[in-house]
A protein has these predicted regions:
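Glycine-rich loop(s) and the adjacent beta-strand/alpha-helix scaffold that form part
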Residues: 1-36, 158-159, 163, 216-224
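Short, conserved loop/turn and helix-capping segments at secondary-structure boundaries
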Residues: 4-12, 144, 211-212, 234-237
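Flexible, glycine/charged-enriched surface loops at secondary-structure junctions
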Residues: 28, 95-103, 161-169, 228-233
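Short, well-ordered loop/turn elements at secondary-structure boundaries
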Residues: 120-122, 160-161, 191-192, 211, ...
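A glycine-rich dinucleotide-binding beta-alpha-beta segment and adjacent secondary-structure elements
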Residues: 138-204, 232-245
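Glycine-rich phosphate/pyrophosphate-binding beta-alpha loops
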Residues: 200-208, 264-266
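Internal hydrophobic alpha-helix adjacent to the cofactor/substrate pocket in enzyme cavities
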Residues: 210-233
Length: 289
């Protein structure tokens, strides 16, 4: 079934237009949790989690901007929830063969959790506001590709969700990525000049991973246009350097996520010395004044 993100069409022929030049493509999968109406939730039956007020910055050069912290909540699934989910597994694309690609190891769907850890009587769920001006909540920990009626029936067995209203169900998709070993350390393609690839399309997963690649690709795209030496970061300079070096030298066989354990210089790559490591390099590029 072709499709993009919810309510969006699939992107047809884009991959084919790239692979015909010799760039290798593969498939991975990802999923997203259900979005729920916060007005239908019994908050008194959950534990609260307050935001952090002790902010630590990476740089002293910009004015402090305190983001308003919103409260989150936690609760747990139970055996009744798991039993409904188990009965629905034949309808899950992740388990009936419709989706066969590899997904993020550290963001398993709720179906995967109950199958992989059948001895666990409960799994934690986190309710996260989607913004200051909406009642919509992101139900972290309940990523699913099951039909909506099964998702809703299972969730209603959680005491705090007995009157739950769902805005959008969780769902899973397969997507194309391109072999990152065909990229330079600048994230420019070795095959197509001036084509830069960054983010999930390189086989990574995660916001910071995508953002880190994006800034390096953007810097080097600008350098290609206006002239200058290619900009790269070493494994001893930044986690971005570790990430990109792993991608372009080792490649990926599952969605890649950055960990401190991947960095042999992790004692040097600290939050408290980020400004000393990177400010001078950013200044020479004109990124800071």
């Amino acid at each position: 079934l072709a499709g993009g993100r919810i309510a969006e069409p699939a992107s047809y022929h884009l991959t084919e237009s790239i692979t015909r030049h010799g760039i290798i493509a593969g498939r991975m999968k990802t999923g997203t949790p259900v979005r729920i109406d916060g007005r239908s939730v019994h908050y008194e039956l959950m534990e609260t989690q307050d935001g952090e007020n002790d902010f630590h910055r990476f740089s002293f050069m910009s004015e402090p901007r305190k983001l308003k912290q919103l409260q989150c909540w936690t609760c747990f699934t139970n055996e009744e929830v798991h039993e409904i989910l188990r009965k629905g597994l034949p309808d899950s694309p992740l388990f009936n063969g419709q989706i066969q690609s590899i997904g993020p190891r550290y963001c398993p769907s709720i179906e995967t959790k109950i199958v992989t850890f059948p001895d666990k009587p409960q799994h934690q769920l986190f309710l996260e506001p989607e913004g200051e001006t909406t009642q919509e909540l992101y139900l972290n920990g309940f990523s699913s590709s099951l039909p909506m009626d099964i998702q809703l029936a299972a969730l209603k067995k959680v005491p705090a969700f007995k009157d739950l209203v769902v805005y959008r169900p969780g769902y899973a998709i397969e997507y194309d990525y391109f072999d990152p070993t065909q990229l330079k350390h600048t994230l420019e393609s070795k095959i197509i000049k001036n084509l830069f690839l960054a983010g999930q399309v390189n086989g990574t997963t995660g916001y910071e991973e995508a953002g880190g690649q994006g800034i390096i690709a953007g810097i080097n795209a600008d350098i290609n246009c206006h002239g200058g030496e290619p900009f790269t970061l070493g494994r001893d300079e930044a986690y971005i350097g570790v990430l990109i070096d792993d991608l372009v030298t080792k490649g990926v066989d599952e969605p890649y996520r950055m960990f401190t354990s991947r960095a042999e210089y992790r004692i040097l790559l600290r939050q408290d010395d980020a400004d000393m490591r990177l400010t001078e390099r950013a200044y020479k590029l004109g990124l800071v004044k």
